[in-house]
Amino acid sequence: MSEKQNEKVYDLSFFMPGQTIEAEEVEVPISKRFVDKEGNVVPFIFKAITTERIDELEKENTTYKNVKGRGRVKELDSQRFYARIAVETTVYPNFKAKELREAYKTEDPVEVAKRVLSVGGEYANWLNKAIEINGFDDDLEDLEEAAKN
């Protein structure tokens, strides 16, 4: 039997442009402090972002430093990187919204998120959920370690 006959043929049509299912929005309660008029917890709405956008965020949060004996070293601000992923992933509340930035007196959407999610654990819950929705199943420590290497 020739090698060609043993080769298995795989259907690549599943991976062609236009064949993928778009990422869905996911509602998740992040804090019990945000309630509507009926007293129901207001969920945050998340939607995964593209790999290309994650790459852009990584570049925006990476600096290069000259280290004696090692040359130019790449350094990722992993906390800011993950926070930016979370801001981009959060559809509601939109931390980039002008009204929120003005209300919290900052132009930085990450700062807005920190001020909105000011009770211990809320900010971490929000970050973890955004990371999870983007397909990162590892915990943040593992991701930070991988990003450093």
Swiss-Prot record:
Top-level lineage group: Bacteria
Region forming the signal peptide: none
Family in the record: To B.subtilis XkdN.
Protein name as catalogued: Uncharacterized protein YqbN
InterPro entries listed in its UniProt record: XkdN-like (IPR014986), XkdN-like_sf (IPR038559)
Gene3D superfamilies: 3.30.2220.30
A Pfam short name: Phage_TAC_5
